[in-house]
Amino acid sequence: MGKVRHSPKEGYFGEFGGRYSPEILHDALAELETTYKKLKKNKHFKKELEYYRKNYIGRPSPLTYAERLTKVWDGARIWLKREDLNHTGAHKINNTIGQVLIAKAMGKTRIIAETGAGQHGVATATVGAMFQMETVVYMGEEDLRRQELNAIRMRMMGAKVVGVSSGTATLKDATSEAMRDWALNVSNTHYIVGSSIGPHPFPTIVRDFQSVIGIESRKQFKKVNGKLPNAVIACVGGGSNSIGMFYGFLRDKKVKLFGVEAGGYSTEPGHHSATIQFGRTGFLHGTKTLVIQDEFGQIVPAHSVSAGLDYPGVGPEHAYFHKSGRVTYVNVDDDGALDAFLEICQIEGIIPALETAHAFRFAKDLAKSMGKKEDILICLSGRGDKDVAEVARLRKGEFS
């Protein structure tokens, strides 16, 4: 296993990362990096961030022992980090609260975002309303169909939701449109990137704001159990909830870390979003990382039943963790995720996001291979209210 580097050198994680962006964005990215470095050391910023985490998001989020799952799966004990209980229903608010404070410090009056499952869009609309900033969210037309509820929530909070019909009309295309908007309106606009992707310093900023998940989890788990979990599992699309969860345990070599990508409906190109398994080193949205691409280096469309995992790349720090061997990456197919979604609903009375359902499906197999005195901690990245209509459509109303 290679040495894990927590602080990137000039925006790199090993060979991955960097800043590959249009010249028009260079000054904005430099301003963002400089401002963030200053704010990280600023006592008032830290105090303000902590205030909103506690009094607006509702942190710390609970650690829940999944007693029924543990009994039914008949293996390792199952624990859940409940990011679904945050305000807005997912981990995304951890990042948007932090970034809107950066935007305010830079004097920006307008914020924009991309979104897939809609949770980052909702979280951005939320902070836009709270800080009275003009808010625009880009969302693929296919995702607007799948996640109509979240689109309505964004509009109710005053955000303008722009449907993107180019390409596959999903997260990659929404991200591209948001980048174009930022390039055209860089003087008054901050782009709140939603995942641990994009040009430096975005992967580091997003990781830092999401690291509260793992830091809290480690402290909570040790307090309850007097030890650390044997395994930590989180779903991976771009990778923000997982990078945040893993961050708390990176130095604990005895804790195995597992990232679960979307296996789609086959291993054929265009049928999955399993970037770690099938991707090659390339460039996407301003960063050097692993990308699903064809023999000519063209981006191959991604697919997942889950809009939040439907992305043909992965955050550069995840690419680094894969290459270093610190994190093991696997994938779960659409049917497996749908089965797990319903199983968690019916066994624990929790409706999980389809993204997290991928992690649950892998956890089931892992738990059965472990001892009953061992522990698995799962990042429940968000609630699945947004997914119930799509699951009902795909399962034709049959939930048994």
From Swiss-Prot:
Q: Which domain of life is it from?
A: Bacteria
Molecular function GO labels: tryptophan synthase activity
- So, what pathway does this thing act in? Amino-acid biosynthesis; L-tryptophan biosynthesis; L-tryptophan from chorismate: step 5/5
Residues annotated with N6-(pyridoxal phosphate)lysine modification: 92
Q: What is this protein called?
A: Tryptophan synthase beta chain
Reaction(s) catalysed by this chain, per the record, are: (1S,2R)-1-C-(indol-3-yl)glycerol 3-phosphate + L-serine = D-glyceraldehyde 3-phosphate + L-tryptophan + H2O
Database matches in PANTHER family: TRYPTOPHAN SYNTHASE (PTHR48077:SF3), TRYPTOPHAN SYNTHASE-RELATED (PTHR48077)
* Entry similarity comment: Belongs to the TrpB family.
Q: What does this protein do?
A: The beta subunit is responsible for the synthesis of L-tryptophan from indole and L-serine.
> An example Gene Ontology cellular component term from the record?
cytoplasm
What Gene3D superfamilies does the annotation carry? Answer: 3.40.50.1100
Pfam families reported in the protein's UniProt record: PALP
InterPro entries for the chain: Trp_synth_b_CS (IPR006653), Trp_synth_beta (IPR006654), Trp_synth_beta/beta-like (IPR023026), TrpB-like_PALP (IPR001926), TrpB-like_PALP_sf (IPR036052)
HAMAP family named in the record = Trp_synth_beta
Q: Which residues form a coiled coil?
A: none
